[in-house]
Amino acid sequence: MASEERITALKEFLAKDPNDSFSSYALALEYNGLGQTEKAIATLRDLVQRDPKYVAAYQQLGQLYAKMNKTREAKRYYRRGIEAAEETNDMHAKREMEEALEEIEDEW
């Protein structure tokens, strides 16, 4: 299935269940894969507002902002993701985001 078809399918899932965090996250990844970074970011930001414990979304936001050299935003989302990871006991994601945050801070 091509990315555009997956996007259509994910939008259909979300029309039926707007609170489906997994489908929102998958939609953001599809947008990013097509180079539609702003749509990916908007989708992820909506997701973390709706589901503040969806750790992977913070990690993805941090990565996207870091690639765009938007260091302040990347740090903010990594820090929020670390907090969410602690709350959900996702120590693997916590470590990954701590390492990413350290890399950003070392660059500055």
Spans of features found by a protein language model:
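Alpha-helical linker/edge segments of TPR/alpha-solenoid repeat scaffolds
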Residues: 3, 71-76, 100-108
